[in-house]
Amino acid sequence: NYCKKNKLILIFDEMITGLRFNCSSVQNQFNLKPSISTFGKWLGGGLPIGIIGIKKNIIKKLDKNKKKIFFGGTFSGNSINTFIANRLVRYVYKNKKNIFDNLDKKSEFIQKEINLFLKKNNIDANCVRFSSMIRLVFTKKNIINRSQRDFFENQKKKIISEFRKYLFENKIYYPSSGIIFIATSTSYKQINHFIKISKKAFKRIKNSR
């Protein structure tokens, strides 16, 4: 309503969040209607892809321009990437209940196990989750946005680096973004290994302080 009232274009970057929530996105979860949306990541099925969704009223205004607007990129219009993305979305949508129930269940298990450990050992960290997306936050405080998270974590760069290094030494790649995604193929054996090593890493950084 604010954007509409002030004649502003609302743009959503859903590169990470696109179709991750029961085959829907953040805008669907909160009933928001951006004018422009961007998607990518898993939609390519392992291949690089970027998708832009633009509302018809925006496209019509662009079309009124006498000069043609050029959209280009290394993988623009790549038939293989587009074919795979199309098939992948169709498959996921058709099987979304089984897929997302599986992902949510595994993600919830990780969050519960890690938070129980952190609370029991009085460690200043927290495992947060939105559907199947997980993030280890290195503060107990109830953060409400990225700026707050970065404020606290910037004070613990060395600790986070040690945590990441320990996981890497135990054959677990912990991304620099800190966001953890679970796949349907991820087994509980792998999940328990991640939890076990994460607990050891947390204990290690706590004792080193």
What is the predicted function of each stretch?
Residues 1-209:
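Conserved N-terminal phosphate-binding loop of PLP-dependent enzymes in the Aspartate aminotransferase
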